[in-house]
Amino acid sequence: MEESKQNYDLTPLIAPNLDRHLVFPIFEFLQERQLYPDEQILKSKIQLLNQTNMVDYAMDIHKSLYHTEDAPQEMVERRTEVVARLKSLEEAAAPLVSFLLNPNAVQELRADKQYNLQMLKERYQIGPDQIEALYQYAKFQFECGNYSGAADYLYQYRTLCSNLERSLSALWGKLASEILMQNWDIALEELNRLKEIIDSKSFSSPLNQVQNRIWLMHWGLYIFFNHDNGRTQIIDLFNQDKYLNAIQTSAPHLLRYLATAFIVNKRRRPQLKEFIKVIQQEHYSYKDPIIEFLACVFVNYDFDGAQKKMKECEEVIVNDPFLGKRVEDGNFSTVPLRDEFLENARLFVFETYCKIHQRIDMGVLAEKLNLNYEEAERWIVNLIRTSKLDAKIDSESGTVIMEPTQPNVHEQLINHTKGLSGRTYKLVNQLLEHTQAQATR
């Protein structure tokens, strides 16, 4: 069983696309879920920590792993080096940090970056060296795990930095800091800022652009499954052509998260049809229970397959670091996204099954929905009561009878018009491109 859980674990595919500090919450989750032996996780944590300045944390884990009170000599020496380097960077950044901590001095700053740089040089003898020192100090603070300090200094650095590459690096650092502090609103703002820069025409090379989009989507997973509006935001980002192409060519594992968002997000239901076409293209080359569930329901109409996949999907969700967030309620622990997913998945199965059959045996339906007979009956009664379903239950024969629905002429007209407007838009675009090509010859 543990092995099958590990087969669904996307950490080996996701971790290389994250800053190493962002991998720690994933390790914490995997350790809590006991997906891997404790010793294996602790060793991986130490390996990761050795590439950061969080030496005290590494020492604690070493003691826990090897059941000792002593830390290795190299860790003790590394700690001395880190403290000395921090002190040195603190001194180099001190003039600018003192200025930023002085409210009266900060009031002299304006929206004009060039004016600020000149004013700092003339009045406070603060030049490029001190600004560079602030960046190095902020970066070092981040490496030490002081995300709050790093976020503040990186923000200030960006207001003074005139180097675009450095400014971009600082923005990535600011995004990581906000994610690690779980400031989801601010993190979303920083994510959108980064997206704007990455999508701009002036952004380095197309290849670099694709790589940055892939990183952005991976980092965004933390925000999308924690922010109140995240399930809509993930669809709006991942479903854009440029981002969807990047997923299909370089990161198909991200389809799990887009598919989950579509299943639990009723507001984006109209876009699901287009996403099903993507699944048709991808589901032979990339296997994931959540993708396969959608293929069973909407591509193959395989309801027995969908029933099996629902059980696998539940396993996937509770063991996924982004989807399996647990909420403690008294003595009970629940996974809200799992419950929401299963409810909507049943609805998908039911709606599609009902389009094919007009009279449905309740026992068969209960089996397809992974419910017992009484649960299925209650579930359907509730759907009818809340007007989500135009049907009635024949208790004597134990069947659900679907009421024939007349096609809504108004809806059909809107759908045809949408299709026409889409084709017209493409046609106009092609004509414009052709005209521009003629003009440049």
Curated annotation (Swiss-Prot):
Sample GO molecular function, one term: mRNA binding
GO biological process: DNA-templated transcription initiation; flower development; formation of cytoplasmic translation initiation complex; photomorphogenesis; translation
Chief location category: cytoplasm
Signal peptide (residue range): none
InterPro entries: eIF3e, eIF3e_N, PCI_dom, WH_DNA-bd_sf
Pfam families: eIF3_N (PF09440), PCI (PF01399)
Xref: SUPFAM superfamilies: Winged helix' DNA-binding domain
UniProt keyword Ribosomal protein, yes or no: no
Subcellular location: Cytoplasm; Nucleus
Residue ranges of coiled coil: none
SMART domains from the UniProt entry: eIF3_N, PINT
Gene inactivation effect: Several floral development defects, including delayed flowering, reduced sepaloid petals and short stamens. Male gametophytic lethal.
Gene3D superfamilies: 1.25.40.570
More details: The PCI domain is protease-resistant.
Family to which this protein belongs: Belongs to the eIF-3 subunit E family.
Protein function: Component of the eukaryotic translation initiation factor 3 (eIF-3) complex, which is involved in protein synthesis of a specialized repertoire of mRNAs and, together with other initiation factors, stimulates binding of mRNA and methionyl-tRNAi to the 40S ribosome. The eIF-3 complex specifically targets and initiates translation of a subset of mRNAs involved in cell proliferation (Potential). Negatively regulates translation during flower development.
Protein name: Eukaryotic translation initiation factor 3 subunit E
